[in-house]
Amino acid sequence: SGNFVQRGEPAIVEKFARAETALVQGVDLVLELPVVYSIQDAGGFATGSIWTLDHVGVTDVVFGSETDDIDLMKAVSEVLIKEPEHYHDLLKKHLKTGHSFPNARKYALRDFIHTENSTFSHRIEEIGSSNNILGVEYLRAIQEIKSKMIPHSMRRVGASYTDEEHRGEFSSATAIRRLIQNGNIESASQAIPKESFDIILREIRSGRGPVFKEDVESFFISFYRLLSRDDYNRYYGFVEGLDARFQECSLSGSLEEFLHCVKSKRFTLSRIRRLMYYPVFRFTDNLIRKSNEFGPQYIRVLGFNEKGRNHLSNIKHSMKIPIITTASLWRKVVDGALKKEMEIDVDLLEAQLERDFAAVRFYASLFRYPESRSKCSDLLSRVIYDEEDS
């Protein structure tokens, strides 16, 4: 993800700094998932991710989950792809009881597997966690785009993703963010490799971080008070009365109050957190539908070492979409792609890329110091090159 992540929050530090933390730990190549995918639900996030990896010739994809049973995940993904009539009926039944779509789907899958697949019926409850759901969506996306990529599941150890307790070197991402937010830098450093933590510390000292969901509170409260119901209807996801709920709750005194005002049995907090950004970044139905159908229209490189750079050099002549390493030259890159008759939709490319640029501008407005917020643009950023690992 770039500067805004799938849980519907700003990242703790900006995308190039996070790319640098990965490179110093031995990663060869860091690519950005466009923001039109990074703050979608698990299905949209996985679709954009798999398209991106497939375009650059990745042969194997590894993801963390609470189960390492890839066969169980494949069985569930097959149901989601084929949508058998029995499963579809179960899904409608659970939706009619008022469950949110993620929960209705989870219960429908549980009921379907219990009756149709005795091999996995005793383990279907494992699929309910967010990481397992995302893993299933990766498998679904691999099949839907007909990728030859081989999936591998790596079992998570230590704290669960949302565990807020500090547990030393195996603390969750949630716990680490909470420690940093509370100023407990020393404890946070125990859970992050020193080279990576030094980069995070550099960003904090410069005023370019840490950024938390609370930092967008005043903006969102003001922004949503200015919108009418017609405004909401221009954007993706505002269905089943959500436009009315957002408008009614816009008079809330805090972001937390707003979220719980909008929340219902059908609309989960995670969905609402993501949805909050859609009017800000102008996520229309057409943009999201086309993005999910045709995939990212470019590859955005955030960082590489010599090995990663060589890989890009080796594949550039067989690429179906352009590779953007210097954002300020994106028009030149697109012109070159058109001359090579690459398979791109220029209007969709511009729409996706402009949202990435907007995300950087918005994120920079959350920095602590005015000098850090000033003149911060994706067009001024340079790809990170890790020479030490070359």
Labelled PLM ranges:
Residues 1-18:
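N-terminal catalytic cores of NTP/NDP-binding nucleotidyl/phosphoryl-transfer enzymes
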Residues 20, 24-34:
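A glycine-rich helix N-cap at a beta->alpha junction
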Residues 12-16, 24, 39-47:
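Generic alpha-helical scaffold signal
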Residues 33-390:
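Active-site cores that bind ATP or allylic diphosphates and position pyrophosphate for catalysis
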Residues 3, 19-21, 60, 345:
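Functionally constrained cores in energy, signaling, and assembly domains
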Residues 16-18, 22, 68, 176:
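Short, charge-rich amphipathic segments
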